[in-house]
C-alpha cells in the first residue's frame, strides 16, 4: 500500500480513477485530463471480489485511467481497523489484476465531506443516498489530486 503523491503520469492524457470501497457498493470518480478536478461517475454494486475487480477494470478501460486511487478508512487516530483491512485486501487484489499504479489515501471523514457537498449543492436528502458513494469517491480522488499538485508545486524551483 502506498500513498504516492509524486506519481506523474507518463501517458497522455492524465486520467485518475478514484474508488470508495464499501461493503455493498464501490463509489467511482474520475479526474479531468489535467488532474485538477474529480467528479463522481457512478457506483459498482458489490457481488464477489473477482466480479468487483472486473467491474473496476471496465471503468479503467472506459476512462483510460493511468492511476487508480483508493480510499483507506483509517480510524480517527490513524490506525487500521477492520474496515480498512477489508479495503487493503481489495487493493492487493486490484494491484495484482491491473498493470497501472494503485495508490491509497486516508479517507477519514470523506463521507461527511461528501454529505456536506451534496447538501451545499441543494441535492434533496432522498437523492443524496443514491449519490453519496460516488461523491465520496470524488472527495477521495480530489484529496489525492490536491496533495499531488501541492507536492509537485512545493518541489518546483523558486525563481
Curated annotation (Swiss-Prot):
Task: Quote the EC number.
Answer: 3.1.-.-
Record key words, sorted: Cytoplasm, Hydrolase, Nuclease, Ribosome biogenesis
**MF terms per GO, please?**
nuclease activity
Chief localisation class: cytoplasm
Annotated GO biological process: rRNA 5'-end processing
Entry-linked Gene3D superfamilies: YqgF/RNase H-like domain (3.30.420.140)
Compartments annotated for it: namely: Cytoplasm
Q: Name one Pfam family in it.
A: RuvX
Sorted alphabetically, the Gene Ontology cellular component annotations on this record are: cytosol
* Top-tier EC class: hydrolase
Question: What S-S linkages are listed for this chain?
Answer: none
What residues form the membrane-spanning segments?
none
What's this chain's function? Could be a nuclease involved in processing of the 5'-end of pre-16S rRNA.
Q: Which family does it belong to?
A: Belongs to the YqgF nuclease family.
Stated name of the protein: Putative pre-16S rRNA nuclease
Please tell me the species this chain comes from: Synechococcus sp. (strain JA-3-3Ab)
